[in-house]
């Protein structure tokens, strides 16, 4: 699709309010950027992986949950609608804790994927709020509705034909000149609707898969303020 670019940001580029603001400026600086794919905030995935290991004591679980809360709170305090944003994050933290307690009874790759997926879901939601904070219309989109994969949890294989059909059906109609679509890297879902992940570093893969499905002009990946352009033919 002509005049449609995807911007992808890694964890350090959305790790705090200032980093998110810099990433926001990159997006709005390119009038063709209509879709943004982001990772979890820096450090969050590692914390979630630790919880998913099934080896955390109750005190360690509480300690990590508090770290996760603080990472996101340091972004929320700069935004509007703080009560609603905190409720959203707290909902995820509650689910993370419940899933962690299940992992302590016996973990597996499917449960791990469910736990680690919360990172991208939280960061992308706050990124939408940041866009609105700066007066730019943005819409949150759950990439799992189009990122169809097999059921090999922790390193799922994308089903490109289905991704293309789903992206054209569910994502493409949302794209316009006024709204930025914010979505998640790394995560997907199988045919049963169960959450899967593409493996560590999967956010770049997500952007490439969406780009291929939609035939975008370019994908811009920004990591630590360095920029690479990947052309999709």
Predicted feature residues:
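Nucleotide/pyrophosphate-binding catalytic subdomain
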Residues: 1-233
């Amino acid at each position: 699709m002509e005049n449609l670019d995807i911007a992808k940001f890694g964890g350090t580029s959305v790790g705090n309010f200032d980093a998110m603001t810099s990433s926001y400026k990159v997006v709005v600086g390119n009038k063709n950027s209509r879709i943004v794919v982001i990772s979890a905030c820096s450090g969050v995935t590692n914390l979630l992986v630790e919880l998913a290991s099934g080896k955390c004591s109750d005190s360690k679980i509480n300690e990590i949950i508090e770290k996760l809360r603080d990472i996101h709170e340091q972004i929320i305090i700069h935004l509007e609608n703080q009560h609603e944003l905190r409720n959203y994050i707290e909902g995820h933290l509650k689910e993370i804790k419940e899933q962690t307690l299940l992992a302590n009874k016996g973990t597996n790759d499917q449960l791990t994927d469910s736990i680690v997926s919360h990172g991208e879901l939280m960061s992308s939601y706050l990124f939408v709020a940041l866009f609105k904070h700066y007066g730019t219309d943005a819409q949150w989109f759950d990439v799992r509705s189009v990122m169809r994969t097999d059921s090999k949890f922790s390193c799922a294989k994308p089903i490109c034909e289905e991704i293309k059909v789903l992206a054209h059906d569910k994502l493409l109609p949302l794209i316009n000149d006024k709204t930025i679509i914010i979505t998640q890297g790394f995560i997907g879902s199988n045919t049963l609707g169960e959450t899967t992940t593409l493996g560590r570093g999967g956010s770049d893969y997500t952007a490439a898969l969406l780009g291929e499905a939609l035939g975008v002009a370019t994908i811009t990946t920004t990591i630590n303020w360095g920029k690479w352009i990947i052309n999709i033919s």
